[in-house]
């Protein structure tokens, strides 16, 4: 990607015809993600097969073997639970009940999912950085296709009940890819801003809409 051209592209005002041409590709990305082999697959069936193979070899086999994870079924339960609640603030008590993991084991397994580039964590924005670390995070998936493989749902975006979560997950992943920390903001009365980006000393709030 040539840097100067990319900067020009970022400053372009997208016209409606361009947006309409782009939308089908965006919707497909929200369902199948961006793994190269998946993106290059010609049909939906082929994309789904490749994603299932990635899940079965990378997650179900390699990660568990390399890290020598005991009681691996609990990790599978955890990733399923996280996939079903992307964009929601983590409730550790609920996750413990679902997975059978205690609080310490939960944190350990969530760290593993981050370090193996499966999930990413969104911390609550706070001016006191120490406070950020002790508050409950949200969890997203770096690749939407991997997440949809976990929950076994490849329906088109237009037919999805979790459309808002798919868009929010896309935004979280792109923010992370651009080198920013992924954070959200929430008041005690539960008013919320989806993302807060700290850029060159400025704080930029971002709200994701699905309509």
Short names for language-model regions:
Residues 39-203:
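Accessory nucleic acid-recognition modules appended to NTPase machines
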Residues 1-34:
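Amphipathic alpha-helical segments of the small helical/lid subdomains adjacent to P-loop NTPase cores
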Residues 202-211:
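Active-site ExK catalytic segment of metal-dependent nucleases
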């Amino acid at each position: 990607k040539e840097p100067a051209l990319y900067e020009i592209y970022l400053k372009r005002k997208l016209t409606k015809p361009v947006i309409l041409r782009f939308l089908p590709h965006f919707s497909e990305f929200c369902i199948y993600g961006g793994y190269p082999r998946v993106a290059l697959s010609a049909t939906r069936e082929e994309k789904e097969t490749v994603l299932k193979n990635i899940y079965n070899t990378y997650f179900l086999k390699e990660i568990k073997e390399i890290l020598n994870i005991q009681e691996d079924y609990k990790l599978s339960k955890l990733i399923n639970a996280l996939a079903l609640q992307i964009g929601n603030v983590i409730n550790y008590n609920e996750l413990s009940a679902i997975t059978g993991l205690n609080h310490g084991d939960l944190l350990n397994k969530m760290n593993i999912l981050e370090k193996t580039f499966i999930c990413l964590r969104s911390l609550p924005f706070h001016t006191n950085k120490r406070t950020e670390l002790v508050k409950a995070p949200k969890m997203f998936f770096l690749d939407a296709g991997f997440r949809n493989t976990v929950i076994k749902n490849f329906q088109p975006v237009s037919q999805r009940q979790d459309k808002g979560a798919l868009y929010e997950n896309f935004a979280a992943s792109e923010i992370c890819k651009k080198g920013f920390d992924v954070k959200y903001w929430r008041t005690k009365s539960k008013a919320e801003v989806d993302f807060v980006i700290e850029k060159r000393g400025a704080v930029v709030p971002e709200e994701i809409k699905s309509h």
